[in-house]
Amino acid sequence: MASGKEIKTKIASVQSTQKITKAMEMVATSKMRKTQDRMAASRPYSETIRNVISHVSKASIGYKHPFLVEREVKKVGMLVISTDRGMCGGLNINLFKTVLNEIKKWKEQGITVEVGVIGSKGIAFFRSLGLKIRAQHSGMGDNPSVEELLGIANDMFDAYKDGKIDALYLAHNQFINTMSQKPSFAQLVPLPELDTDNLGERQQAWDYIYEPDPKMLLDSLLTRYLESQVYQSVVDNLASEQAARMVAMKAATDNAGNLINDLQLVYNKARQASITNELNEIVAGAAAI
């Protein structure tokens, strides 16, 4: 059995770690709430611009933007959004498993795959697999902006426009609630058809004169919309990261508490055994006299 001093040292070490994990839990909670506010603030913009795109595309008879045209898929691009830091449970691993399953399905159909990766964890993972990384970005911090994402987003959009890929998919972690985050995998371009049932009456009752012409407006709106989708996915993934880290750090803090209790019990037993031995020695000495 370890000595009382050794056990005390272990208890102090675990208590120090517990303070760190508790602080990380509190920081993650605060960051998660701020990120949720950014998610809520950006969503109305994205939804409104998507509805305008639907209306303009219907008004632009005879013109189809490349981002709206389906074509035979021989090459696929994927934009994967991961985290820059760890200590967030199985968040990244679950996302990577989903992505690898999709890649496997495409390769079985003879479709080649290229990836663009946001986040250092994803970059390291896909490099280790030897996959071709078309574009990458990391070091975003806790408050990413649309501007810093334009480089990698436009790289992937240009690859689609130039015919280097025939479809682009977006993979990230979707924030459900504090205890639940799930991998999300969706087609980004060609833009999926929008359900406009609830806009039908408005579109029949109203018509618009577009300045400049609908073609120029549609070109601009589609680019802005796709950029906003990438930004929203990054913010969604960031909220998922902070929630997962909060849960992981809470579990670590609780486990540290349990370990401290166990070590304290071992220490008490060791101390009791030491006192018993000393009493036995005193009694034995008295009997010898």
UniProtKB/Swiss-Prot annotation:
Q: Which GO terms describe its molecular function?
A: ATP binding; proton-transporting ATP synthase activity, rotational mechanism
Compartment list: Cell inner membrane
Superkingdom of the organism of origin: Bacteria
What InterPro entries would the database entry show?
A: ATP_synth_F1_ATPase_gsu, ATP_synth_F1_gsu, ATP_synth_F1_gsu_CS
Q: How does it sit in the membrane?
A: Peripheral membrane protein
Mainly localized where? membrane
Q: Which UniProt keywords apply?
A: ATP synthesis, Cell inner membrane, Cell membrane, CF(1), Hydrogen ion transport, Ion transport, Membrane, Transport
The reply to whether Membrane figures as a keyword in the UniProt entry is yes
Q: Which CDD domains match?
A: F1-ATPase_gamma
Q: What's this chain's function?
A: Produces ATP from ADP in the presence of a proton gradient across the membrane. The gamma chain is believed to be important in regulating ATPase activity and the flow of protons through the CF(0) complex.
Family assignment from sequence similarity: Belongs to the ATPase gamma chain family.
HAMAP family listed in its UniProt record: ATP_synth_gamma_bact (MF_00815)
| Subunit structure and binding partners | F-type ATPases have 2 components, CF(1) - the catalytic core - and CF(0) - the membrane proton channel. CF(1) has five subunits: alpha(3), beta(3), gamma(1), delta(1), epsilon(1). CF(0) has three main subunits: a, b and c.
The molecule here is called ATP synthase gamma chain
Write down the species.
Answer: Mannheimia succiniciproducens (strain KCTC 0769BP / MBEL55E)
